[in-house]
Regions:
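Short linear sequence motif anchored by a di-proline
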Residues: 1-174
């Protein structure tokens, strides 16, 4: 499960990394948590990219109430195509979620120990994400979830799940 991450890169680095046409307005943070508005990169019809801020905790479009609904922060890659909460977003509304690292907690004899997982060079990368629009009468909510998968051998001692990471050469395919 991915429940905390960080994005500390500069606006300029994000523009360059994701080949954006406009400057990005966001607050760098070492502790991004569910229910916060987070930076997402979406691809437009002309294959250019732009950033949007979405609430982290996907509310399905068919949900009756945005406040009492489950806010789904993660979607399992193994079931994302079939689950009613995610299947439409998986087909039509994918996004990239910029990050510099994420946190996982491993159980040990003293309770839990936090690990910060990041690239060795500390550079940006992107989580695979889904976004959704929930609408009811005059209220509209845009929200997202991070897709997770089984942990790699390197990650397995810390946690059995990890975010799906998309490499830059696959951004357009995602």
């Amino acid at each position: 499960m991915c429940g905390r991450y960080n994005l500390t890169a500069s606006s300029e680095a994000i523009v360059e990394h994701f080949q954006l046409l406009r400057q990005v307005k966001f607050q760098p943070s070492y502790n991004i948590a569910p229910a916060q508005k987070i930076l997402n990169v979406v691809e437009l019809d002309d294959q250019s990219r732009k950033t949007v801020n979405l609430y982290w905790g996907l509310v399905p479009s068919w949900s009756k109430d945005s406040k009492n609904s489950s806010h789904l922060i993660n979607a399992r890659m193994e079931t994302v195509r079939e689950k009613p909460s995610f299947r439409s977003a998986f087909k039509h509304r994918r996004c990239l979620i910029p990050a510099n690292g994420f946190y996982e907690w491993a159980k040990n004899e003293d309770g839990k120990k936090a690990f910060h997982i990041h690239r060795q060079d500390q550079q940006l990368f992107a989580f695979a994400g889904l976004w959704e629009q929930w609408q009811h009468e005059t209220e509209t909510l845009y929200s997202c979830a991070i897709i997770t998968t089984a942990a790699t051998d390197l990650m397995q001692p810390i946690h059995d799940r990890m975010p799906v990471i998309i490499t830059p050469e696959h951004y357009h395919q995602w």
